[in-house]
């Protein structure tokens, strides 16, 4: 049968999904896959949860669409209220969109408009980090320090990445405390060089995702960087698309650093795969400034605050809270990391296991002592992903967080609902996968 669907790799064959339940996905041949990455770190509560799907059927029968400039809806209002209740600090006001990329660009627009309302119209530049990924639309890509995804569009996008990634694994004779100070000084210097009067915000993933396989900053990092932002009147925007809503064992990952952003960007786990939805969640002070000014946020999409998507996110969040899944993410993540560390000790190519909660990254190296990376042509990441999939395990390909774009890594991020037995299965298949790839490398 011919296919006219544009897929990630145009010449590759993909299995056709048949159904999914819990932590497993099944293709049309009947093959079972353990979803070790929750899709794209998305399916936080697993597949086919009837508490959610039954409510969604009811929603479709009640109202399938309402345009946000004509009506509001109960699901959108209730979701916004629940987020305001559960998110830390005064990050209380939700603007719902359809994807993380849209949510990032909404956050950028709101930040710029905030400064316009304060008569500081020159503040329209953003700072971000290298080894970061904030989305594939042009504004989000402008923030992304991810060469592989930037280079084709360099002439169209802004050069916002300016700050080093907090890659502790690759520190050279520097303590974590010294690194935090160096990072704060780097941000401070960059703001001064450009001029704080031109900078609207600093954007960062609390734990780096696709560009860095769960690179996790040391203690004190965001406390210091957010302090630098406040000193220079620069908004701190936390890209929590991958990390938010319990993935790291906290509602927002910035809570690990006792930090509350001015804007939190949510996605992926917000709808948890049941519907496309994302959000820019904004502080009271930003909203109050805009309310006292123009009174209008200049952004929106046809499907913003879609009732069905809002209902999906509402029921997902209710399910997470009802079953204590954020705490489960923290506990299960600690167990899984320990088991991955044990597996790494038996491998000659795993350099580091890192992350928090159920967002874990594994970086592969050619030499564990020197941390030398594999040559790009060896395509270690793809070998690991393909071998794992062949054995019935899905893991998420990632970069290793090196500015040059070199290095190999994968992300393991199963649903919060993964059982102890499923974790054992995950570890077993992953260990076998790494051993098989390593054995083939030795043959070569």
Curated annotation (Swiss-Prot):
Which parts of the sequence carry N6-(pyridoxal phosphate)lysine? Answer: 268
Q: What EC numbers are recorded for this enzyme?
A: 2.6.-.-
Arranged from A to Z, the UniProt key words for this protein are:
Aminotransferase, Pyridoxal phosphate, Transferase
Record Pfam families: Aminotran_3
Q: Which top EC class is named for this enzyme in its record?
A: transferase
Q: Which Gene3D superfamilies match?
A: Aspartate Aminotransferase, domain 1, Type I PLP-dependent aspartate aminotransferase-like (Major domain)
Cofactor names from the entry are: pyridoxal 5'-phosphate
> What GO molecular function annotations does the UniProt record carry, in alphabetical order?
pyridoxal phosphate binding; transaminase activity
Query: What family classification does the UniProt entry report for this protein?
Result: Belongs to the class-III pyridoxal-phosphate-dependent aminotransferase family.
Please report the name of this protein according to its UniProt entry: Uncharacterized aminotransferase YodT
Species whose genome carries this gene: Bacillus subtilis (strain 168)
| Record gene name | yodT
